[in-house]
Amino acid sequence: MVRKHRISQNFLRSPRIALMLIGHSNIRKRDFTLDIGAGSGVFTYALSKKSAQVLAIEFDRETFKKLQNNTKKLENVEVLCVDFLRFNLSKLPKNYKVCANIPFHLSSPIIQKLTVAQNSPKSIYLILQKQFTRKLIVSDKNFTSALGVKTFPFFESKIKKPLQKSDFTPPPAVETVFFEMKRRETPLISKEEQPIFNDFIEKMFAVPEFYKKNCQPKFKTKKPSELKGEEWLEIWRFWQNSDKIE
């Protein structure tokens, strides 16, 4: 397979590595899987062997032609040349799963899109920068990002496997991991509350005075990035029952 290097995207060297990673997922032969930023199709090919149906999305037209050529004999694979951030996820079957090696610079918007969608995936598996994933895991043991807090009520996140630089071409300059986000069977807040919750979290991280005015005194000595998930839920419920100070 011919591969083209693009900014902040490092491609897996072979389908063998992709198959090994899929082995660390909960993807099964009955599943519909989505490959985002499919490149020339290394992950797509591996997914075609491990799931019932694969939709591979690639935005770069030159790379898409290679993807088409490399997957034309795979009967359970459909390929689309579209911008994933504009793609309508409601077109996909319920409980689809995502497994992809995405461009690192698009990690946040891609995760945001997947996790706020009405038809969100049952499981998400992404190759990501290790430092970025640490901020997605809500814990008082590491600094958490606003995105990590926003996804916490709806998805359980963890690092599944560290990767070697030699797994990629070109080798990345940063440490990378295979990251899992599993949709909670019962979300910790309702899906209907998600837009308001997300706006609230964004403001709590961005505006220090808003944070200090809208959380309990016991949390004011901590930064937003230092709180545990359970503490954020407590703050959220406190704010819902308060006068909502701006």
Task: For the regions a language model picked out, list residue spans one by one.
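Catalytic cores of RNA-modifying enzymes
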Residues: 1-199, 203, 230-246
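Short helix/strand-capping connector loops at secondary-structure junctions
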Residues: 1-2, 213-222
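Flavin-binding catalytic cores
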Residues: 199-215
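Catalytic core of IPPT-family isopentenyl/dimethylallyl transferases
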Residues: 221-231
